[in-house]
Amino acid sequence: MLADFCIRLALGLLGCLLLLSPIQSARPAPGTRPLVGANFFRTMFLVALGFCVGALLWLWPEVPTPLMVCLVIASILTLAGSVTWSLERSPGGVSLIVASIGVLIAACYLRDETSLVGGLSAAALLGAAMGSMLLGHNYLITPTMSMTPLYRLLAALAIALVLRAAVDGFALLRWTSGHSMANLNGDLLLWLPVRWLVGIVAPALLCWMAWQTARIRATQSATGILYVVVVFCFLGELTAQLLHKYISHR
């Protein structure tokens, strides 16, 4: 379960980088500033590397060979990405983002090919939440940076919440249509509201608050709100994995 969480989070974080104009950030035109500094891309690669290695260690030594290959390759690519984005003009930086994303999507598929859409929607939500929070910290270092990157990731977070709610809602409807409501025992009735209230509703409200706060350029306050969003999304997705494991055996 935690391995899935790590893989999805690494995938989501790297996916966020595609929204931050990586080509322009790596090679800004003369006289212009990059939308986001290369150090942020380097940080995201390092965080993704940590989650890739964490997933590999969590599954070891029973990790299937194809999945192990994917995770090892993803770890190498993210390590290379962190080095590349510390160099001038970040040679190959964008290619490493795309390649890492492709390998991690393959890892998600190998983990559970029957729920790839659910895994990708979870990756989008986790990545947008944590990516927004980490980007908020960047404004403490570079307070004059454009607000466009934060707006983009907050918009991505809102879209990811809608997508995740739709995917989970559809899965829940499919399950309830094929099972008697009597199967909703005490444990399921306890965790289901937690998953939706903590993992979807609360982050949606907080996302709106962070957006309104960012509009007045109170980036420190927005970052604080996004901390809470990250915690709620983490709890919601871990609960969702528990529910998925529970109902898949019924």
Question: Where do the PLM segments sit?
Answer:
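Polytopic transmembrane helical bundles with strong interfacial aromatic enrichment
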Residues: 1-143, 149-170, 192-250
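Membrane-interface interhelical connector segments
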Residues: 138, 143-146, 176-186
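Conserved beta/loop motifs at nucleotide-recognition and modification sites
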Residues: 172-174
